[in-house]
Amino acid sequence: MVVNYQHPIQCIRYVEKQTAGFRNLFLASAGSKIYTYAAETGRKLAIWPEAPNASHSTVVSVAPSSEGDEPSAKKRKVSPVPEQTAKGGQPEASTAWSTIPILTVSSDGNFLVAVTGEDKCLRVFEIEESGHLKQLSERHMPKRPSAITLVDDDKTILCGDKFGDVYSLPLIDTGKSSIAPKIHAKMKPNQPAATTLTVHSKRNLASLEQQLRHYSQNEKTAEEKPTSAFELHLILGHVSMLTDLVYVSVPVDATSGRQRPYIFTADRDEHIRVSRGPPQAHIIENYCLGHTSFVSSLCVPQWAPEYLVSGGGDNHLIVWRWNESRLVQKVPLLEEGTDSEVVVRRIWALSLTKAANSQENANVILVALDGSSKLLCFTLESDGSLKAQNSIQASGNVLDLTVPSENSSIVVSVDAVREAGSTQEWRTSPSSPSTLVEAFRLKPASEGPLDWERTSEAITAQINSEGTSDISADLDEKQKKELNDSLYSLGNLRKKNMGEDD
């Protein structure tokens, strides 16, 4: 029996349902699919997309592209995609995307927002009691989304894209268009002056026939056709590729209880901008400037919202007192004397209980580096400095993590396809079952640096045994490189020539 690799889990989210009687879930994206698992058992409940049904079609909203003169905004019906046969003989949908790089869940656990890669589509799902995902809308953005977050009590999506723009759009599609319909004037295309009466040679007749076909097509496109798009509002923009987006609300003062929202945006050109929240997002409060390479991840700790932790292509993190644009600390990510490039994949701020049944919390900052099997751990001190703790050693490159409701452990998704520490070299042979997720918790030590231990949980073992979808063990080098690049693309943000945009 041939053993294949399994698609690693690129994103994983814990979903705590607020509705009584609904089960808690893990949502995970791997390859072109989203999987739901029961949080109590790890049993796989559903896969999206399901096998296509020829009797159904989906209404798709398309926003106008920023390229070209004419908006492509329209609603169109998408025919069901052809079926393929997956392992075990089950029909499998052929999709227009190969990855789902972004998942965001509403605070009540009722909705999921996902970004599918190549088709630039932002999809909203209702998370049903059974764990199945019911797609409510799919909205094709002008450019590929690079970061999303939910605001205004989960009523609004903020979406940043690779063109540097940030849009605001409702979570539930209203069906309204924010773009004034444009009526294409009836223009009379230039008709060929020649006719079959004036052209006689075979070659010229063929040329005339081609011109007449082209004229006929132009006549059709010149007809009046109103455009239609979903509600979409441009609220701010960068002149460079936007890489991350964070939304926070902080108290205006100590007595009134009023909150003021801010939007933090980072880009490829080393900038971090602090803007006011909508409807004043055009007002720039300040910048946090100090990085010398791209910024890929921003993190504002919930327990200390006056601080911002940022990282990217530099070999250090930076802690900011963001409302003052003040650099508090540069935190090295490499040991002294090490000369290599690093890329920060993601930064998390977590508040964890130190042990089961413990009331003592540990506020930690965890950092994943692209192509590294170590999770770096820090504590944020009262003066805003980061203090290094013992790191977490996973069995493969760390891709993402989530925290179940008890806050005593973390569930980490790892790459079991490539060698630990490499983004290109594949393991000589796949394991069975493949390690998709691992769980870790803080050791109950009372003194010294924080330390971690792996937990042997039945839940993660069940998720691993369920698997995702197969990757053939017989792929050629070109196919492997395409899969590598789809999972590890942050390094492409690094400019090849310092001072010049490639």
UniProtKB/Swiss-Prot annotation:
WD repeats: 4-58, 95-135, 290-330
The protein's role, per its UniProt record: Required for the formation of N(7)-methylguanine at position 46 (m7G46) in tRNA. In the complex, it is required to stabilize and induce conformational changes of the catalytic subunit.
Pathway linked to the protein: tRNA modification; N(7)-methylguanine-tRNA biosynthesis
UniProt keyword annotation of Repeat present: yes
Region (Disordered): 58-93
Gene designation per UniProt: trm82
Annotated protein name in UniProt: tRNA (guanine-N(7)-)-methyltransferase non-catalytic subunit trm82
Residues passing through the membrane, by range: none
SMART domains attached to this UniProt entry: WD40
Subunit structure: Forms a heterodimer with the catalytic subunit trm8.
Example of a GO cellular component annotation carried by this entry: tRNA methyltransferase complex
Any one GO biological process: tRNA (guanine-N7)-methylation
Cross-referenced InterPro entries: Trm82 (IPR028884), WD40/YVTN_repeat-like_dom_sf (IPR015943), WD40_repeat_dom_sf (IPR036322), WD40_rpt (IPR001680)
Keywords for this protein: Nucleus, Repeat, tRNA processing, WD repeat
Keyword Lyase (UniProt): no
Subcellular localization, as worded in the UniProt entry: Nucleus
Family classification: Belongs to the WD repeat TRM82 family.
